[in-house]
Amino acid sequence: GPLNAQHQS
């Protein structure tokens, strides 16, 4: 899987 994940709402 990804090493860095970000979520913006």
Swiss-Prot record:
This is 66 kDa cell wall protein. GO terms for cellular component: extracellular region. Keywords: Cell wall, Secreted. Its main location: secreted. It comes from the Eukaryota. It comes from Daucus carota. It is found in: Secreted, Cell wall.
